A protein has these predicted regions:
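Histidine-centered beta-alpha loop that forms part of the nucleotide-sugar donor binding/catalytic region
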Residues: 8, 120-123, 173-174
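Carbohydrate-associated surface elements
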Residues: 38, 154, 175
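An aromatic- and histidine-rich active-site surface loop
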Residues: 87-112
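A short, charged, and often flexible helix/loop element on the N-terminal side
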Residues: 48-77
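Acidic anion/phosphate-binding donor-loop and adjacent secondary structure
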Residues: 128-129, 160, 175-185
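A short, histidine- and acid-enriched strand-loop-helix "catalytic/donor-clamping" loop
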Residues: 106, 114-131, 147
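Membrane-proximal helix-turn-helix segments that form the acceptor-binding/catalytic region
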Residues: 131-148
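N-terminal subdomain of nucleotide-sugar transferases
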Residues: 1-41, 46-54
Length: 185
């Protein structure tokens, strides 16, 4: 498969999980395309099946804040069309789910189908996502995702308690690469 992954490229939990998942998928011969504003810090080795696509937002004096959400949606459209992505996996709902939804709508008008899965990681729901300035967009984007996962049962319950979610949320717990971590005496 050709898989797009949108994530924060930092050492935070969602970025680490997304990058490690992408690396594992690439080892299984899937083509993985990371779409983000800088190369993920955990992309620390070469793999011929991993690609990085940088998102850059126009720095224009009119904008007090760069419109990253729009730039991300445009980059998703470009990568999906050029690379013929089969699916997109976005990690952390803000702003990735709404950017994916916008990109999906644009692509649909061009005759291209791109399903996307949103993985909820924590503060995108429990802290930032609940803020009234983001909540309606987060709720709408989650409900319009083709699939939704949560990294824990507790986060799933928090999401259902604080948002009007009509989609099923599948719990897929965080994982550990046991080849990297071994018990010591």
């Amino acid at each position: 498969m050709k898989i797009g992954i949108v994530c924060y490229p930092t050492y935070g939990g969602s970025g680490v999980i997304a990058t490690e998942l992408g690396k594992a998928l690439a080892k299984k011969r899937h083509q993985v395309h990371f779409i983000t504003y800088q190369e993920p810090v955990r992309l620390d080795s070469f793999n011929e099946n991993i690609f990085y696509h940088e998102v850059s937002a126009l720095d224009y004096p009119l904008f007090q804040y760069q419109p990253y959400e729009s730039a991300l949606a445009s980059k998703i459209v470009d990568v999906a069309k050029f690379e013929k992505l089969d699916i997109l996996h976005v990690h952390y709902a803000i702003p990735h789910a709404s950017s994916a939804l916008m990109a999906q709508s644009i692509l649909k008008e061009k005759g291209f189908r791109l399903p996307f899965v949103t993985t909820l990681h924590g503060t995108d729901i429990t802290l930032v996502g609940k803020d009234p300035s983001y909540k309606p967009v987060v709720e709408y984007s989650i409900n319009r995702s083709n699939g939704v996962t949560s990294v824990s049962e507790n986060l799933r319950e928090e999401t259902l308690k604080n948002f009007n979610i009509t989609r099923e949320i599948e719990v897929i717990p965080n994982f550990i690469d046991f080849s990297r971590f071994k018990k010591t005496d």
